Amino acid sequence: MASNSSSCPTPGGGHLNGYPVTPYAFFFPHMLGGLSPPSSLPGIQHQLPVSGYSTPSPATVETQSTSSEEIVPSPPSPPPLPRIYKPCFVCQDKSSGYHYGVSACEGCKGFFRRSIQKNMVYTCHRDKNCIINKVTRNRCQYCRLQKCFEVGMSKESVRNDRNKKKKDVPKTECSESYIVTPEVEELIEKVRKAHQETFPALCQLGKYTTNNSSEQRVSLDIDLWDKFSELSTKCIIKTVEFAKQLPGFTTLTIADQITLLKAACLDILILRICTRYTPEQDTMTFSDGLTLNRTQMHNAGFGPLTDLVFAFANQLLPLEMDDAETGLLSAICLICGDRQDLEQPDKVDKLQEPLLEALKIYVRKRRPNKPHMFPKMLMKITDLRSISAKGAERVITLKMEIPGSMPPLIQEMLENSEGMDTLGGQPGGPRTGGLGPPPGSCSPSLSPSSTRSSPATHSP
């Protein structure tokens, strides 16, 4: 026993079974076989054996381990629960997180961002109290935007986010090289030619003006309306001629050709007239040379659509589009597989693909240092559709303002492809598909197979 006591660890130092022990070994209990550290320094001598070191019993270890947090391993942490957000504050759809200050879905987040970044101006055609939910949210953009503001979405968050992205994303030069193959070059030239033959450039026109209601807005100037409706009818005919020259368009079924023309004719009309915008005089010029200022355009029939159209024309100016780009963008608007009631949407999509590729290659080759110009052009199609939808609504109110009947070809062009005549038809009624003019009319039909080119007609 005496020999064992000589190897007993002491607080001041010594040896433990032949190994030296530092004076502060009690601070590391694992070195002492699992012993707990002392609760206080003065009582250390009472807690350590004086007759020799012995291995503590399991009961002792259990007691000691429960009295010390340092040697009891903590149980593994459970995996974090998935983060659950409140439903979208705007439409009550499933939220993807907090966007611009509130819980919102991806749809409402994107709608709010686009509305603020583009300074969109919407109109409610009811009482400005439309119900907004995940089913109805796309029916009224005005009320949807108002609800975004009501639930707390912040304009400044959109602007700050945009500025941050501009700072964070370094400017990169377009490193891709775009080679125009003979096939692509041939397609571009065909579309350019089709556009130029059906829509003369502004520099080719002999501009003239009129003094009709040029200074004050009125609900409708009948003389200007008569001239505008005449030019619009000619524009529809020229749009059909343009479509017939596009590669592959006439291989579609007659029904699909008519569906595409009726869906996109107003898009193309607006795009074309906006390329003839002169910002210095704030005027637009039609194909016969008639040049109208903003007030006259309003009084000719554009009405509440006027400022939207002029704003779109201003947005086109920085793009500096030439005839090939305008023609290709018009063709992409026309040949689009997402139009309703198409018989062969997949075939339409396949016809659109080379047009998209041709526009991308042409735009990026023409502007090698502006890689974002191509997507900017494509985004204009969305703007055109928005304006065209309001244009179709404008025709309904215009029908009540004009003294006579709506020109047959304009009425046929705006017949809704879902079976509702926007000018007074009944939903679900029989569809003529625009195969011929109304009985007794001498106006040409919208049908591509029946429209004839006329050297005397010019589009707006």
From Swiss-Prot:
Residues 1-87 are annotated as: Modulating. GO terms for molecular function: nuclear receptor activity; RNA polymerase II cis-regulatory region sequence-specific DNA binding; zinc ion binding. Its main location: nucleus. Residues 425-435 have a biased composition (Gly residues). It comes from the Eukaryota. It is found in: Nucleus. Residues 442-460 have a biased composition (Low complexity). Keywords: DNA-binding, Metal-binding, Nucleus, Receptor, Transcription, Transcription regulation, Zinc, Zinc-finger. CDD domains: NR_DBD_RAR, NR_LBD_RAR. Residues 52-69 have a biased composition (Polar residues). Pfam families: Hormone_recep, zf-C4. Residues 183-417 form the NR LBD domain. InterPro entries: NHR-like_dom_sf, NR_DBD_RAR, NR_LBD_RAR, Nucl_hrmn_rcpt_lig-bd, Nuclear_hrmn_rcpt, Retinoic_acid_rcpt, Znf_hrmn_rcpt, Znf_NHR/GATA. A motif (9aaTAD) lies at residues 408-416. Belongs to the nuclear hormone receptor family. NR1 subfamily. Heterodimer; with an RXR molecule. Binds DNA preferentially as a RAR/RXR heterodimer. Receptor for retinoic acid. Retinoic acid receptors bind as heterodimers to their target response elements in response to their ligands, all-trans or 9-cis retinoic acid, and regulate gene expression in various biological processes. The RAR/RXR heterodimers bind to the retinoic acid response elements (RARE) composed of tandem 5'-AGGTCA-3' sites known as DR1-DR5. Required for hindbrain patterning and appears to be required for skin development. Composed of three domains: a modulating N-terminal domain, a DNA-binding domain and a C-terminal ligand-binding domain. This is Retinoic acid receptor alpha. It comes from Gallus gallus. The gene is RARA.
